[in-house]
Amino acid sequence: MNLYRQSCLRAIIAFGTALVLAMGSASADAQQPTDYTALGLEDLMALDVVAINVLGTHIHPAGQWMIGYEYMFDNMDGNLEGTHRVGDSRVLDAYNASPTDMTMQTHMVTVMYSPTINLTLMGMLPYISKSMNHVMRDGTRFNERTEGPGDAEVHALYTLFSTDNLRHRLILNGGVSFPTGSIDRSMGGSRLEYPMQLGSGTVDLMPGLTYLGQNEQMAWGAEFDPTFRLGQNGNQYRLGNRYRLSGWGAMKLTQSASLSGRVDAESWGDIRGSDSALDPTDEPTKDVSAQGGRRVDLMVGLNAYFPSGGLKGLRLAVEAGAPVYQSLNGPQLQTTWLARVGLQWAF
């Protein structure tokens, strides 16, 4: 692991340690409610033990604003074809170069507002940094880097159903992604491959459905949120549709802190069409038939919420995990581990 990745990992661990200390401090002043069923939505948010990055959980009281920041780190190392590991030499039998490893960092800024108790509006804008290493047939190694804004998203979350005590809720998500991320990134005068571009280049529909369950000590739920690409982009291709299904459970450690576990399953298709500036025989990352796949991630997280005091409305979270299953239309780089750090403030 290079120094850059070590620095990222140390930062995540340091944040997690600080989070645990903060949770302990917050719990010392917290008081246990005596009648859970009498609590309103704002009080339920103080009890909420759901992971910060589950989109459908962001339902807020009428008139409330929330701003958020999330840092996401994805590490990829080695190639898979189906579920089998493929060495560089085998990749180089078919292509001029082989990707060896890649990192992706995403800084996501989110703004939310709830005009009514049943409706939350949300806007999201990512800033993405990518780095990919390669090896050529003659043993030459090289690196490619790119960074910039990704595709902006807007969402509307609407409560379709809720029990009187709010222990069971069904949330509908209507989302749209706009092509603000570049699909024309180049390096050394050559167009970068598909995974190194920053956006889809198309308007994408992002519907979703979320179930939330919660009692005094636990929370659970499931979410389905596909992404449908509309038409081809300006470079005459479109990314494959994505289908994501998540299930989670969480248990309170203190009145203000929780431990969560999440299973995240995702499937995505190959690219339709092709960018004429990319030679598919050059490397698999330029081959439209080597872009799809399926993956199941197992994530564990710590979450904290401050319902009162000087940090009232502040929510902190750290989550990390790794794939437990991958099958890729390869050869394609496999994901080895992921980490998420989030900060949100409601007012």
Please place each PLM-identified region on the residue numbering.
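Residues that define the transmembrane beta-barrel architecture of outer-membrane proteins
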Residues: 63, 103-107, 146-152, 168, ...
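Residues on the lipid-exposed face of transmembrane beta-strands in outer-membrane beta-barrel proteins
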Residues: 57, 69, 109-113, 123, ...
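Outer membrane beta-barrel transmembrane domains
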Residues: 80, 84-90, 236-347
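Transmembrane beta-barrel strands of outer-membrane/channel proteins
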Residues: 67-73, 123-127, 172-178, 222-228, ...
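Outer-membrane beta-barrel biogenesis signature
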Residues: 30-91, 165, 171
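Short loop/turn motifs that connect adjacent beta-strands in outer-membrane beta-barrel proteins
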Residues: 55-64, 76-80, 101, 118, ...
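Outer-membrane beta-barrel proteins
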Residues: 49-56, 115-117, 157-165, 170, ...
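Extracellular loop and loop/strand-boundary signature of outer-membrane beta-barrel proteins
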Residues: 54, 92-97, 137-144, 192-197, ...
